[in-house]
């Protein structure tokens, strides 16, 4: 049996369903493990949750945050996405990358690893244990980051994104206390991305063009070039999560 929830993700209201069996066998034990880890380290800890585009990272993080605040004995977690570390649109429009023998504007591959300010992300991660920080948030309604939009306040921070476990420089210079990789890669993801882009204001035709030329290659790159996490999960054919 599944339960339905609604979360605000990057400025959009998203509905999600989670199986009760997944909650009992995976999510609650994970949160208990993170609670113990934070207590042992006696400091703020960073957890990476990496997965391909449209695998459900953001909604899963929101759900884990919800569970941690409603189940007694768990240390509350705070979910934060890395999309706020995108370069601004004017930077993407004015800079290029060399790929497959072509010079391509970064704006055409927005969402690819090259379109993030990894140095900025690494700097904030390295100072995570100091005073409460304010991190950027990506707003899909304006297609740009919003600075100082999220206060980092909890002792367990779950950072989610496509490239957090990418085994390529400079991404492989990032460090965390615990990592999770969620494997997913099928055609249904493309439809979810199309709908998400249309909710952000793109026409269906434009959304499908972007998804085929940009998002699908990102899915393949994430699946093939990412390191395994401390916990590795995948949905089976019945939509139930399994450890792999």
Residue ranges and their predicted role:
Residues 147, 169-172, 195-244:
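Small-molecule kinase domains that catalyze NTP-dependent phosphoryl transfer to phosphate-bearing small molecules
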Residues 78, 85-139:
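Conserved nucleotide-sensing/catalytic segment adjacent to the nucleotide-binding pocket
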Residues 57:
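Conserved lysine of the Walker
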Residues 54:
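Walker A (P-loop) phosphate-binding loop of P-loop NTPases
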């Amino acid at each position: 049996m599944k339960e339905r929830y609604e979360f605000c993700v990057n400025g959009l209201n998203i509905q999600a369903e989670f199986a009760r069996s997944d909650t009992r066998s995976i999510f609650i034990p994970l949160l208990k493990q993170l609670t113990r880890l934070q207590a042992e380290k006696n400091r703020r800890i960073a957890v990476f949750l990496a997965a391909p585009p449209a695998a459900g990272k953001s909604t899963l993080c929101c759900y884990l945050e919800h569970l941690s605040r409603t189940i007694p004995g768990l240390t509350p977690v705070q979910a934060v996405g890395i999309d706020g570390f995108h370069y601004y649109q004017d930077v993407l429009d004015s800079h290029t990358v060399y790929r497959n023998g072509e010079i391509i504007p970064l704006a055409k591959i927005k969402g690819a690893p090259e379109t993030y300010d990894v140095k900025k992300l690494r700097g904030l991660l390295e100072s995570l244990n100091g005073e409460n920080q304010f991190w950027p948030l990506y707003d899909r309604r304006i297609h740009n980051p919003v600075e100082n939009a999220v206060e980092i306040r909890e002792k367990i921070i779950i950072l989610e994104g496509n490239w957090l476990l990418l085994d390529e420089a400079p991404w492989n210079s990032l460090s965390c206390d615990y990592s999770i990789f969620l494997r997913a890669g099928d055609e249904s993801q493309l439809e979810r991305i199309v709908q998400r882009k249309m909710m952000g204001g793109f026409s269906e035709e434009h959304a499908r063009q972007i998804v085929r030329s940009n998002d699908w290659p990102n899915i393949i790159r994430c699946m093939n070039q990412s390191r395994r996490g401390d916990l590795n999960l995948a949905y089976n054919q019945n939509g139930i999560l399994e450890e792999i």
